[in-house]
Amino acid sequence: MPELAVQKVVVHPLVLLSVVDHFNRIGKVGNQKRVVGVLLGSWQKKVLDVSNSFAVPFDEDDKDDSVWFLDHDYLENMYGMFKKVNARERIVGWYHTGPKLHKNDIAINELMKRYCPNSVLVIIDVKPKDLGLPTEAYISVEEVHDDGTPTSKTFEHVTSEIGAEEAEEVGVEHLLRDIKDTTVGTLSQRITNQVHGLKGLNSKLLDIRSYLEKVATGKLPINHQIIYQLQDVFNLLPDVSLQEFVKAFYLKTNDQMVVVYLASLIRSVVALHNLINNKIANRDAEKKEGQEKEESKKDRKEDKEKDKDKEKSDVKKEEKKEKK
């Protein structure tokens, strides 16, 4: 495998399904907080394409993070069988269900470097609480300290995304069609997505606040790259105290409120129009029903009169016969 830096990691849906199945089979039954496995895929320049995976027996001590076990004999046997099926898929890294980094991840990553020099760690959250991607990719790098102390291993975040081939897209669409709730409207879905998005934004802001507090108290070293990126984010924020911004915000809010007010008026007029039409239709129906009843009464009355006239004529004929 070429010794190239990773710029992006593409995870296929098959990997996500395999990891969730692994966690449901082992994590819940064995009361394990996380499960570990191996990622298979290929390199395309600086993009890592993770197309397959398999589980690996793993155990660790809850109290001591330095005590852990990963069955590399099982790993080698499984990889040998996978290689017979598809020789293009190679070991490109490993995964665990996190949901965050652990202290012993560096040591596990060093073990995985025996099979893959540029081993990539992908944390897959099987129980996501916020709306967004359930994957986080990392690669180990040497961190140089400003105080002259020896370098140390640390993880650097890598951009990750979900990608699929045509066959996988068809399968995912089929699964989503089966579990999709057709009773939920598009408006409620949009509102739900916005609420989840705001919750995700709130959690990210809390993480930034926690990081800055730890840096300020000296619990974490200063990372100038992170500080510069946060400064860029703050520079992009609008100045809410600026008079022009306040005026523009009020104008836009008023315009939106006018649209909502007009929409409410239109709905009221349409509802009133429908009510009037319904009342007219009911009145016409009652009038038509009354006319039909009167016509039926007249027909019955005429029939009775005809019957009486017929009886009288019959009686007269009989009287004439008797006289003769």
Curated annotation (Swiss-Prot):
Q: Which GO terms describe its cellular component?
A: cytosol; extracellular exosome; extracellular region; ficolin-1-rich granule lumen; membrane; nucleoplasm; nucleus; proteasome complex
What positions does the domain MPN occupy? Answer: 9-144
Tell me the gene name.
Answer: PSMD7
Stated family: Belongs to the peptidase M67A family.
Residues modified as N6-acetyllysine are K204, K214, K316, K317
> Positions of the region Disordered?
281-324
One Pfam annotation reads MitMem_reg
- Its domain of life reads Eukaryota
Specify the species: Homo sapiens (Human)
Quaternary context:
Component of the 19S proteasome regulatory particle complex. The 26S proteasome consists of a 20S core particle (CP) and two 19S regulatory subunits (RP). The regulatory particle is made of a lid composed of 9 subunits including PSMD7, a base containing 6 ATPases and few additional components. Within the complex, PSMD7 interacts with subunit PSMD4 through their respective MPN domain. Interacts with TRIM5.
Q: Which UniProt keywords apply?
A: Acetylation, Isopeptide bond, Proteasome, Ubl conjugation
PROSITE patterns reported for this sequence: MPN (PS50249)
The cross-references to CDD domains, in alphabetical order and at most eight, read: MPN_RPN7_8
PANTHER family given for it? 26S PROTEASOME NON-ATPASE REGULATORY SUBUNIT 7, EUKARYOTIC TRANSLATION INITIATION FACTOR 3 SUBUNIT F-RELATED
The family database entries (InterPro entries) matched by this protein are listed as:
EIF3F/CSN6-like_C, JAMM/MPN+_dom, MPN, MPN_RPN7_8
Supply the name of the protein.
Answer: 26S proteasome non-ATPase regulatory subunit 7
Q: What's an example of a GO molecular-function annotation for this chain?
A: protein homodimerization activity
Cite any additional comment in the entry. Answer: Does not bind a metal ion.
For biological process, the GO terms are:
proteasome-mediated ubiquitin-dependent protein catabolic process
